[in-house]
From Swiss-Prot:
One annotated GO biological process: translation
NCBIfam families: PRK00132.1 (NF001099)
PANTHER family: RIBOSOMAL PROTEIN S9 (PTHR21569), SMALL RIBOSOMAL SUBUNIT PROTEIN US9M (PTHR21569:SF1)
Keywords: Ribonucleoprotein, Ribosomal protein
GO MF assignments: RNA binding; structural constituent of ribosome
Annotated organism of origin: Bradyrhizobium sp. (strain BTAi1 / ATCC BAA-1182)
Annotated family: Belongs to the universal ribosomal protein uS9 family.
Name listed for the protein in its UniProt record: Small ribosomal subunit protein uS9
């Protein structure tokens, strides 16, 4: 094999042809209603997300996204995976989210939406992975320590 390669051009052509036989092959996962499902997590929030082809309507806990997430920044955050994949307005999103605050819930919906998109269209996995949408944000609140006012803040010090 190594003897047959004479130049770098041949090597670059060979690179695309050779893939590992055990490389994971992602396939479309939809239920009997034609919906893709995924769960997303962020801080203390957990979101269950279903997507189906539609007009782009987003429903959170049976309420419209404009009602549930009043801040435009949170709505934009949820739409990011669809915009990155150039699928904005092509899917209806239904999700239930519980726990945490609004920012954590928006992050959980975004994470779940990204995973559901890859279940519906596995070819989008590379784009979403590159954008960092499929990675679980593991940052959580640091616990309070005894002998301290908060996690790191010490009590006020007095010399005398």
């Amino acid at each position: 094999m190594a003897e047959s390669i004479q130049s770098l051009d041949q090597l670059s052509q060979l690179k695309g042809a050779v893939t590992a036989p055990d490389a994971p092959k992602y396939e479309k996962k939809v239920d009997k209603f034609g919906r893709a499902y995924a769960t997303g997590k962020r801080k203390d929030a957990v979101a269950r997300v279903w997507i189906k082809p539609g007009s782009g309507k987003v429903t959170v806990n049976t309420r419209d996204i404009e009602v549930y997430f009043a801040r435009p920044v949170l709505r934009m955050m949820i739409q990011q995976p669809l915009v990155a994949a150039a699928r904005n307005g092509q899917y209806d999103v239904i999700c239930t989210v519980a726990g945490g605050g609004l920012s954590g819930q928006a992050g959980a919906v975004r994470h779940g939406l990204s995973k559901a998109l890859t279940n519906f269209e596995p070819e989008l996995r590379g784009v979403l992975k590159k954008g960092g949408f499929l990675t679980r944000d593991s940052r959580v609140v640091e616990r309070k320590k005894y002998g301290k006012a908060k996690a790191r803040r010490s009590f006020q010090f007095s010399k005398r």
